[in-house]
Amino acid sequence: MRLLAPAKINLALDVLGRRADGYHQVVMVMQTIALADTVTVAVNEGHGAIRLAGGTEEAPPDADNLVYRAAQLVRETAGLSCGVDIDLEKVIPVAAGLAGGSSDAAATVKALNRLFRLGWSDREMETLLARLGSDIPFLVRGGTALATGRGEIVHRLPPAPAFWVVLVKPPFGASTPKVYKALGAPALPDPLPWPQAMKPATTPPGTAAYRMIEALKTGDYGNVLEALGNDLEQVTLEWHPVLKEIKVQLTRFGCDRALMSGSGPTILGFTASEATARSVAAAMEEQWGPQRYRVLIARTLEREEADEWNVDCCR
């Protein structure tokens, strides 16, 4: 079985503070895009191991890979003993703030759920995957969603209006734990002043996520642009001033706005036009390609379309 594992971007990311358990309380609006890895999974009765092939130098096919860990978690939870062969074809840049590894893990669990006829619901898979990482549950369904708690509690939102992003990934990564630590978010009281599992209707006013939820209700691309925000951007841009230059150039070449995705370092340029996206990408590639920066383009991808992709893959 072959499944596509799409990347995610953050349309809004607010860090509300540091909880007593050490995690940060966040409220985020996330969106999948049509930039995807491919995960091929097969049951192998000839051995009882997990065999992972593919990957990259930055994400090698070993026992520390999220795909391997996801497969092992499924086997332990479901009491399975037969072998699993997994091949991973990477397209999404690694350590880029795009959740490529998380999406690969989610695709692996979805494939094994189907292959072994486990009958797990999306919510059950999200709960299971939250044990591996905070952003993995969102990738089970994708589309446009609100993520709260430490990022593992997911609520679907109205789909974002269609748009394109130009992605510029520098030849360096950003450590998510280090970025969060450097942000210096205030300690939160215990118990929290609001529900840990916030819903769209209870998202704190004044946050980028609140503004984004309101913008999505209108279905207007311009309103979405105005609501974009990322609390982590200030940290990563301070460490790597070149990212500020990339943001300026993306808008200078034709994008409507630019924003860092997640903890970075990938910078996103937003446009409603595919032609503009391709034009900006060509200009950025000419400028930054020789310095080993990766330049990609992708459009928004809603859950229903992602499901159709994977139905086609399974035929």
UniProtKB/Swiss-Prot annotation:
Supply the alphabetized keyword list: ATP-binding, Isoprene biosynthesis, Kinase, Nucleotide-binding, Transferase
Which class of enzymes does this protein belong to? transferase
In terms of InterPro entries, this protein maps to: GHMP_kinase_C_dom, GHMP_kinase_C_sf, GHMP_kinase_N_dom, IspE, Ribosomal_Su5_D2-typ_SF, Ribsml_uS5_D2-typ_fold_subgr
State the source organism's domain of life.
Bacteria
Q: Does the keyword ATP-binding apply?
A: yes
Active-site residue numbers: K8, D135
Pathway, per record: Isoprenoid biosynthesis; isopentenyl diphosphate biosynthesis via DXP pathway; isopentenyl diphosphate from 1-deoxy-D-xylulose 5-phosphate: step 3/6
Q: What does this protein do?
A: Catalyzes the phosphorylation of the position 2 hydroxy group of 4-diphosphocytidyl-2C-methyl-D-erythritol.
Q: Which NCBIfam families match?
A: ispE (TIGR00154)
Protein name stated in the entry: 4-diphosphocytidyl-2-C-methyl-D-erythritol kinase
| Natural source organism | Heliobacterium modesticaldum (strain ATCC 51547 / Ice1)
Q: What is the lineage of its organism?
A: Bacteria, Bacillati, Bacillota, Clostridia, Eubacteriales
